[in-house]
């Protein structure tokens, strides 16, 4: 006997903001009659952190041993279950053939943004289940991205230019050199994914050593907080993007201005999450030849979801969502996206909103066929400012994260690949936002 169950989200890029309505369908196909209790759709959103630390202990015999402790924490933001047909105390016969069940859920307004990190994550998913009588339950899962707006225009501090200076002298054989001065400057500290940060770096090398290389890196700093078995924090730092500058000779000064492009990344702070905190900064480093420590300056960066108006070229403000072409509907194999969503790019032949796998007892979770039209543009969440050119919703630069979500059912597929999407803008003058 072959059974199929699929989830189709009406928003093909599976990206939503708090307060949006998630709509979709559960598709079930059975070759023979099935005795079931119900078919359900369960929505959930959670934050989880977990890491393991080791420590050495000496036992009563004076022997040393290594003890491992796992620290963890959990927060739940969304838990909604609906019965699409039947119920826990019912028994119904599902006739052979194909069956489609619609679902709809309104997301709470204050959800934190989706996030994938080394020691923790924030994930949202819908699980469809067919509860069979005297048989294994059949389940399939679909992950989706949730975003929390971070409007840079509402924070006056991120609009201001910032200059940071560091200075040191080098000592060798009781002699002090002239000063080494490193200066970093940006015209603002609030940006969005897709933008280029104009970075000005100045090096005044009054020493007798060469500055072998100068770099500027965008760093992602994450603080994970666990509450079990005790409260503890774990901090990670990753270089996201790096630009380099040429060496600076002894008693030489140089100044450069370069652009550092921001890839698709989650917004700063992860508002409304109490166990994961996210910050970004520019780390400008002068590497000194010889046995000397390097010189650094750091500039905090706020990554938002809505760009500063002052950084949008006037010509691009004319590309309002209302003037963008709508997706074709006549030949599309699926119903058109909801009219309240503006359009956003959708890579052809991708299935970001549906997960699939093959189980052990003849049950298959199969992807719905995707639209074949290369110009089909799916729906995307709306922006609060109609004059801002709409972003695309790009997969996070960190790529695929293997997802294992536990389930009490014996017939659940694990190992789903999940990549959150984040709003990414093209605000360069003379170039239209990608469609």
Language-model features: locations:
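C-terminal beta-sandwich interaction modules and adjacent acidic
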Residues: 1-435
